């Protein structure tokens, strides 16, 4: 979903159900609809759902964005790249290779669907464009603001302290619904959702504006909020927005995406996720990702959940049933 093309962030999981699917489709890899996934690269003259598994048995072939931190970049940085390296070691793969393409419309078709790679490292659970593994992390949109200021203690977008403040928001993402309900849109600053990540970065631009004082707070997809706040030092609070009610979900499970035919590959990855969850968590946390358990409690290093926090019934009602380690 990024603040870039897909933001790696969900852009709407609302009720009724048809809205939920539209939202997930928009999220996944630009979260824009990709109507058809041709299977010309598959072994049979079929579409994306060919029954033949084409996974490379020796090399972990990863589909990635060339400039989309904290997820990945062409320099080999990002938590997706580190998780991929971990999986390669655990699965006995001799190497990790990458097929880079901006995560905008056509990403799945041009990478996984063309058999250039065998795994998309981050994909929202429930989207139809790929087959999902079990989730390997769960996070939420987050509010970022300077520590020690008048916004200290804010955990809801409807908090009166935000009235009249200039809040940055990526256009078309779920927090916008709550901001509109709270009357914050009149003074909000919108940043584009669909962009070419090689040229611009909405999350980075938003955090730069926050540091300059051009906006008072920022609302971003959790991994981006945590990463850019961490890069800025200890000056910003990152608050997962898990207490919003009566609107689209704000917390989502993130999986790995594989081809629909790759059933054994999916099972292999599910085992690897379950066996290495603590190490995966530590990688994500090192990038500032605000990890949440199923009750919206923050997850600490080595997978230990903190004692505080609370669940969001709307999120659990809208989210698919499969948990992080099913």
Residues covered by each model-derived region:
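Extended ligand-binding regions for polar small-molecule ligands
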Residues: 44-45, 78-91, 149, 157-174, ...
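Ligand-binding clefts/hinges and TM-proximal coupling segments of bilobed small-molecule sensing domains
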Residues: 44-52, 174-195, 270-326
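Periplasmic-binding protein-like
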Residues: 65-66, 138-150, 230-273, 290-316
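Bilobed "Venus flytrap"/periplasmic-binding protein-like clamshell domains
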Residues: 66-70, 74-90, 143-202, 223-224, ...
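Acidic, polar ligand-binding/catalytic clefts
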Residues: 85, 97-161, 172, 242-249, ...
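Alpha-to-beta junction loops
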Residues: 93-95, 113-122, 165, 210-220, ...
């Amino acid at each position: 979903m990024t603040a870039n093309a897909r933001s790696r962030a969900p852009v709407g999981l609302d009720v009724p159900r048809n809205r939920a699917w539209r939202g997930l489709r928009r999220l996944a890899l630009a979260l824009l609809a990709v109507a058809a996934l041709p299977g010309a690269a598959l072994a049979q003259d079929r579409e994306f759902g060919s029954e033949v598994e084409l996974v490379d048995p020796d090399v972990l072939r990863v589909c990635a964005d060339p400039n989309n931190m904290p997820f990945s970049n062409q320099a080999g940085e990002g938590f997706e790249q580190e998780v991929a390296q971990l999986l390669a070691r655990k699965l006995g793969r001799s190497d990790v290779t990458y097929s880079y393409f901006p995560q905008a419309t056509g990403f799945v078709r041009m990478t996984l669907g063309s058999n250039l790679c065998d795994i998309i490292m981050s994909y929202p659970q429930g989207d139809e464009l790929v087959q999902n593994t079990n989730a390997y992390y769960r996070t939420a949109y987050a509010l970022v603001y300077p520590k020690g200021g008048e916004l200290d203690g804010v955990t809801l977008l409807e908090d009166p302290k935000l009235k009249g403040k200039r809040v940055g928001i990526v256009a078309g993402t779920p927090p916008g619904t709550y901001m509109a309900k709270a009357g914050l849109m009149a003074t909000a600053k919108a940043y584009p959702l669909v962009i070419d990540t090689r040229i611009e970065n909405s999350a980075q631009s938003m955090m730069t504006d926050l540091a300059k004082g051009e906006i008072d707070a920022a609302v971003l997809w959790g991994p981006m909020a945590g990463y850019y706040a961490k890069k800025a030092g200890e000056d910003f609070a990152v608050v997962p927005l898990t207490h919003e009610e009566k609107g689209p979900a704000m917390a989502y499970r993130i999986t790995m995406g594989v081809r629909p035919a790759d059933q054994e590959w999916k099972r292999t990855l599910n085992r690897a996720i379950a066996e290495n969850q603590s190490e995966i968590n530590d990688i994500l946390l090192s990038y500032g990702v605000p990890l949440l358990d199923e009750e919206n409690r923050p997850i600490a290093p080595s997978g230990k959940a903190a004692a505080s926090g609370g669940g969001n019934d709307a999120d659990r009602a809208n989210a698919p049933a499969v948990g992080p380690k099913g």
